[in-house]
Amino acid sequence: IHHPHSQIVGFKDYDYHQDIKPFHFVGPSIIEEDGLTVNLSQRPIIGFYEVNLILKDRGKLGKFVRYMQLTADYFMHSFVSFNDSYNIFFYDFPADDALYVKIIPRFLTNPLYVGYMIPQIANGGHSARFIHALQQRLHEV
């Protein structure tokens, strides 16, 4: 999809806590304030540049959101010339009251995998057509 859009995804039968852990939000500090942290993930979910924002003091929500905006703007206008998109993912952890956010420059990868390690697979009909077509091609050998 090549147009600006927002998408909210809810999971009925999936708990991302099985795959996403607090260590995914640790890394070299970009900004460190009392109750608010911005860092570069040293254990990214998908790789390279994942900016983590962690809000522990809800009184700093305005500043937190501004840091989110500035990080997204950086990825769009100052990061690399061929990047024109980003994803923002929100997380919580039951043992922690903090709000966790990951902002990731968007390249050609399924966003559900980028944020939650959920691989995208084709539905049964598409899979069957693919298998049939490839079988036909391989049987030509």
Where are these regions (language model features)?
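HIT superfamily nucleotide-processing domains
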Residues: 1-141
